[in-house]
């Protein structure tokens, strides 16, 4: 008998032993048997003290059992108030007409006054708006347009950076004056804007800004 045959035989013997041992263990357990009980079924009543129970198989019916009521502890509520009877037939037709007219006249007068006041306010508001628009246009035409090239923390740094940008783009910023503007943060600190120009028209300022943006230089119209 070869070695392989011996190994196979030993393996079969081990597997058989494990299988029969497991079957013996399962058969040795006690068998559980369920027997029917002889207790009478519990049926909950559907009517308790002349009250029909909606859900018989719930615990609600247990709360419906009332106790003895003491008549001395019962509080009787008073009768409700009787409704008022208003007889409108005793009023004359003239009184009704007079009341209606006396009610409508103040409303008509107030509406007319309000309309006149509104018309006056509209005229005044239109005049104020036109004046503000014309003033803004005059200020813009006199001041011209500037181009923002950046922002820094100090005025000296702003002037130095502006000169550097002007030197970098001599053709675009030729004959342009570099200025600064002090601006306040919300937290109280300040920063400085680097501004170029003044350009007489918006289209001219936009053209300069487009050329700077094409050359990867930040630019904002002011």
Curated annotation (Swiss-Prot):
Keyword annotations: Membrane, Transmembrane, Transmembrane helix
UniProt-recorded Gene Ontology molecular function terms: peptidoglycan binding
Membrane-traversing stretches: 7-26
Entry GO terms, CC: membrane
Domain SPOR: 139-222
Source species taxonomy: Bacteria, Pseudomonadati, Pseudomonadota, Alphaproteobacteria, Rickettsiales
Originating organism: Rickettsia prowazekii (strain Madrid E)
Topology relative to the membrane: Single-pass membrane protein
UniProt cross-references to InterPro entries, sorted A to Z: SPOR-like_dom (IPR007730), SPOR-like_sf (IPR036680)
Domain of life according to the entry: Bacteria
Keyword Repeat: no
Cellular compartment(s): Membrane
Name of the protein described by the UniProt record: Uncharacterized protein RP066
């Amino acid at each position: 008998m070869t070695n392989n045959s011996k190994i196979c035989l030993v393996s079969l013997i081990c597997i058989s032993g494990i299988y029969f041992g497991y079957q013996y263990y399962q058969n040795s357990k006690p068998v559980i048997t369920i027997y029917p009980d002889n207790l009478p079924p519990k049926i909950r009543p559907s009517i308790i003290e002349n009250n029909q129970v909606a859900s018989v198989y719930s615990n609600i019916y247990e709360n419906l059992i009332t106790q003895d009521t003491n008549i001395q502890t019962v509080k009787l509520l008073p009768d409700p108030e009787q409704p008022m009877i208003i007889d409108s037939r005793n009023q004359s037709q003239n009184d009704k007409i007079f009341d209606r007219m006396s009610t409508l006249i103040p409303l008509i007068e107030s509406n007319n006054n309000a309309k006149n006041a509104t018309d006056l306010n509209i005229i005044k508001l239109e005049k104020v708006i036109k004046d503000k628009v014309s003033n803004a246009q005059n200020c813009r035409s006199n001041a011209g347009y500037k181009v923002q090239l950046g922002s820094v923390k100090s005025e000296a740094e702003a002037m130095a950076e502006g000169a550097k940008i002007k030197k970098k783009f001599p053709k675009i910023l030729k004959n342009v004056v570099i200025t600064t503007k002090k601006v306040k943060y919300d937290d109280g600190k300040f920063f400085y804007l680097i501004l170029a120009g003044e350009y007489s028209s918006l289209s001219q300022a936009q053209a300069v800004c487009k050329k700077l943006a094409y050359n990867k230089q930040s630019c904002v119209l002011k």
